[in-house]
Design a protein with these regions (language model features):
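Short C-terminal tail/terminal secondary-structure segment
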Residues: 1-3, 105, 237-238, 249-263
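Canonical Rossmann dinucleotide-binding motif of NAD(H)/NADP(H)-dependent dehydrogenases/reductases
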Residues: 3-36
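Substrate-binding pocket helix/loop in short-chain dehydrogenase/reductase
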Residues: 100-108, 112-117, 218
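Active-site helix of classical SDR
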Residues: 131, 167, 175
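Alpha-helical segment proximal to the catalytic Tyr-Lys
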Residues: 136, 180-184, 246
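Residue(s) in the substrate-gating loop at a strand-loop-helix junction
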Residues: 152
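Short, small/polar-rich loop/turn modules that mediate ligand/substrate recognition or access, typified
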Residues: 183, 188, 193, 248-250
Length: 263
C-alpha cells in the first residue's frame, strides 16, 4: 500500500548537492516524487539530478543560493513549470558553526559580523524564504501542501555552539507557529532535527575530518552508540512529507541516537 510514498508528487529540496539533501532527493525520487534539486554548488547538484534520472526518475537541477529570495522563488517556479504544481518543499540547506583558522569552533564572542550574517542568512532567512515561496504556491493551488525543514537538536537544548543553536532554535519554533497558522489551510509544517552527523564536510558539517578515536568518543555520547548518517534524517523527512503523516504537524523530530531522551 505504501510502496511509493510520494508517487506523483512534486518536491523542491534545497541543499540537494550533498548530505541530508542529496539523500532526501534520491529517496523522494525513489518513492515516486518529481524533484527539483536546488543547491548553490552546481556540479554536486547536477550529479544528484543525474543519479535520479539514471534510476528512471524525474529531476530538475537549479542553482539556488538560499540567501537570495529570487533564487528560492525560482526553484519553486521551476517545480510548477516542469511538473505542474508544488506538493512538498524540504528546506534543508544550512551551514554549521564558524571555525577558527586552527580548525576549532569559534566561541560565541569570537563570531564576526560576517559569521553572524552568514548563519542567519542561510539557516534562518533561507528557510523563511522557502516557507514563504511554498505557501504562496500552495494557496494558488487551493491549499494543502507540506513543508519540512532541517533544524537540529542544537536548537532544542543548551550545549555550546550558541550562535548555531540560536539559528536552529528559530526554525524549531517556526514549525510550531506556522503549523498553527496554516493548519486550517491543510498545510503541514514539521522539522527533522539531526544530532551529530557525518557529511561531506566532516562531522556536523564543520569541515573538519576527525580521527576515528574522536568519532568513537562522540558516538559514545549517544545512547545508541553511533554517529548519525545523512540517509537517516532524510528517511524521516520522507515520512513527514508523505501521507503517512497526514495528521502530524508542528513537531520537531530528533534523529540523534537518543541524545534528547536524556535532556
Amino acid at each position: 500500500m505504501y510502496a511509493r510514498l510520494l508517487d506523483g508528487k512534486s518536491a523542491v529540496i534545497t541543499g540537494s548537492g550533498s548530505g541530508v539533501g542529496k539523500q532526501a532527493a534520491l529517496l523522494f525520487a525513489e518513492h515516486g516524487a518529481r524533484v527539483v534539486c536546488a543547491d548553490v554548488r552546481e556540479d554536486w547538484n547536477e550529479e544528484t539530478a543525474a543519479q535520479i534520472r539514471a534510476a528512471g526518475g524525474e529531476a530538475e537541477a537549479v542553482r539556488c543560493d538560499v540567501t537570495r529570495r529570487a533564487d528560492v522563488d525560482a526553484a519553486v517556479a521551476r517545480a510548477v513549470s516542469a511538473f505542474g504544481r508544488l506538493d512538498v518543499i524540504f528546506n534543508n540547506a544550512g551551514v554549521a558553526s564558524p571555525m577558527t583558522p586552527e580548525g576549532g569552533m569559534k566561541s560565541f564572542v569570537e563570531a564576526s559580523d560576517e559569521d553572524i550574517d552568514r548563519l542567519l542568512a542561510i539557516n534562518v532567512k533561507g528557510v523563511l524564504y522557502g516557507c514563504q515561496a511554498a505557501i504562496v504556491q500552495f494557496r494558488k493551488q487551493g491549499g494543502g501542501g507540506v513543508i519540512v525543514n532541517t533544524a537540529s537538536v542544537a536548537g532544542m537544548f543548551g550545549w555550546g555552539g550558541a550562535l548555531y543553536g540560536a539559528t536552529k532554535g528559530a526554525i524549531v519554533n517556526l514549525a510550531r507557529r506556522l503549523a498553527v497558522e496554516l493548519g486550517p489551510e491543510n498545510i503541514r509544517v514539521n522539522n527533522v532535527c539531526p544530532g551529530s552527523m557525518v557529511t561531506n564536510f566532516g562531522i556536523g558539517g564543520l569541515g573538519v575530518e576527525l580521527p576515528q578515536a574522536a568519532l568513537d568518543g562522540m558516538a559514545k555520547l549517544q545512547p545508541l552508540g553511533r554517529i548519525i548518517e545523512p540517509r537517516e534524517p532524510a528517511q524521516v523527512a520522507l515520512f513527514l512529507a508523505s501521507d503517512l503523516a497526514l495528521n502530524i504537524t508542528g513537531i520537531n523530530v530528533p534523529v540523534d541516537g537518543g541524545v534528547m531522551a536524556g535532556k
